[in-house]
Amino acid sequence: MPTEISVFLLSLQAMPLKLTTYYRGSKVPDLPGTNTFHSTELFRIYEETPGYTPILIVASEDDKPVAKLLAAIRKSVRMFPPGIIKRCEVYGTGEYFNNEADKEIIFSDMLQRLTNEALRDSFLIEFRNLENAMFGYKSFRDNQYIAINWLRVRNSLHSVEKVEERFSPSRIRQIKKGLKNGAQVREARTKEEILCFAQMLRHVYSSKIRRHFPSIKFFQHLENQLT
């Protein structure tokens, strides 16, 4: 993988589309956008967190950014073979700044570029949190991606009144079983408690193939970016 920047020129209708791939946060210029999952700030957090290698693809027309796509190659070490696993994770399908441009075409070019780059070091690429399941469908298929059904469970805690009514019977049984076995729920207030909580979650998620809990350093860098 290149160490800093790579640039490709593609044809987007009558206007050439330039794809620039960034591998170092120090080389990323000021970019527009408000999507946290494709931001320069998250790129730098990935860069500073052990086990993460960020890749940022910026699409430009006439030297003006029209879209960007942030991905991260994550390395995990497991007790069972293969001991070291690298996978690329992307949240969403990027952020776009030109409402008149064809987002599907731009995404197709960025996706192909990302696929070629990421598969050099990772064994799979996973896109999560897709807002529109049909957006980019043809591009995903053309690049050999497959759809995976995934169950999402969301329990709103904005109102604590009658919160049990929003839980499923199986979830309530799990909670009661945990309380019966001595589980406690309380806020972590000190750095030591937060560290212990993070270590516990990493231990729980370490045996799960599709789930991951980042290093505590990820959240420390996130806090530094927000304060």
How would you label these PLM feature ranges?
Residues 4-7, 14:
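Acidic, Ala/Val/Gly-enriched low-complexity intrinsically disordered segments
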